C-alpha cells in the first residue's frame, strides 16, 4: 500500500491560540493513520503548536514555511535553522511559488537554503512547478527540470532521501485554469524520472 504525505501549509493564518485548536483537531482526525502528516503554521505559532502536538502524543511533524539562507547574523526579520530546531521543527518548506513570485527567490537562492537545511538534518519539502507562460510555450518539462537541477545542485545521494518534491501547478493558481489529475500525474511522472536520472 502506498503511503501518502499530507502536508498542511497554513500560510499567514492562525494566531497561536487558533493554531493550537486547529492542530488538536487535526491530531484527533489522523490518529492511527499510516500516512505521514505535517503541519506548517506561521513562525509565531510554531512553539504553541509544537507543544500542543507533543502533549497529545501526536506523530504529526512540525514544519516551517520558510527559513533564512544564513545561519546567524544581521538579517532583520529572518528566522534561522537553529531557531527552528530549538522549536522542534523537523521539516521546512522551500521554493514555494509565493516565495519565488512575490519575493523573487531564485533557484540559486533556494538551493542555498536546501543545502543548509539538509546539513542540519531537516527534511525539506521542495516546491516546483511551471508558470502559465512556460506551459503555454510547451516548456513544462524544461521549467520543472531547471528548478530541480538548480535547487538540488550539490545535494548528494546521501541526503536526497530527506527531500520531498511537491508539485505546484503555478499556471493554475489565480488564472481561472484548472489542473486535472492527468495534468498533475504527467508532471509527477516527469519529476520521478528526472530525480532518477540525477541520482540513479
Summary of predicted features, one role per range:
Residues 1-200:
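Active-site loop-to-helix "anion-binding N-cap" substructures in soluble metabolic enzymes
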